[in-house]
């Protein structure tokens, strides 16, 4: 927030109120996540398109898939019609591959649709290697921590945005809220001083 306020030329004295404003924000406090130690499993892919991490999540009674590039953290959320292999691959084709091309490797948890023969055939057609995440002794995935953390970010921001829209009486579709919250984070989150959008598109 401080970075955006500086871009707007807000007076310095206003920065002292940031913590107070956040602490009294009804939408922020309503969906404040429980603090916990994050568990990441990224393997530091060298370039955009090397490794694409995918996972499914549910919100507002709908099923979505989050796709995130491991190298630059650029992500896309899309509504998923079904959990079978054909539906997952079609979602990938329409929302990722047709814009950025096929990735070299797809990493996911032990999702049935991604493990299916239909999905395997589609991956072979595009020369995509599948990598299934393993689990530790506690049953937690060992290599999908990155995408799971970003799902938390998307869900939290979507819940806040939906509550704000509802209170203001704005007729916004809930699917649009989830998709746009994921998209907006490509322009807001920073890694080593650059946003994911800058890493992929060259600008914000």
Regions from the language model: what does each represent?
Residues 7-15, 171-178:
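Generic detection of long, well-ordered alpha-helical segments
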């Amino acid at each position: 927030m401080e970075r955006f306020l500086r871009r707007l030329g807000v007076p310095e004295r206003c920065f002292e109120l940031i913590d107070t404003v956040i602490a009294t924000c009804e939408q922020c406090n309503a969906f404040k996540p429980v603090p916990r130690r994050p568990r990441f499993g990224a393997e530091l892919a060298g370039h955009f398109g090397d490794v694409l991490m995918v996972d499914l999540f549910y919100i507002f009674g709908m099923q979505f898939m989050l796709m995130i590039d491991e190298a630059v953290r650029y992500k896309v959320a899309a509504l998923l019609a079904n959990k079978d292999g054909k539906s997952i691959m079609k979602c990938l084709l329409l929302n990722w591959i047709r814009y950025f091309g096929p990735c070299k490797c797809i990493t996911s948890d032990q999702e049935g649709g991604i493990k299916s023969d239909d999905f395997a055939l589609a991956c072979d057609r595009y020369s995509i290697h599948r990598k299934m995440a393993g689990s530790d002794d506690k049953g937690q995935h060992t290599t999908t921590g990155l995408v799971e953390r970003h799902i938390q970010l998307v869900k939290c921001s979507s819940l806040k945005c939906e509550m704000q829209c509802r209170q203001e009486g704005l007729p916004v579709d809930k699917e649009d809220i989830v998709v746009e919250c994921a998209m907006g984070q490509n322009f807001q989150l920073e890694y080593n001083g650059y946003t994911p959008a800058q890493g992929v598109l060259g600008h914000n």
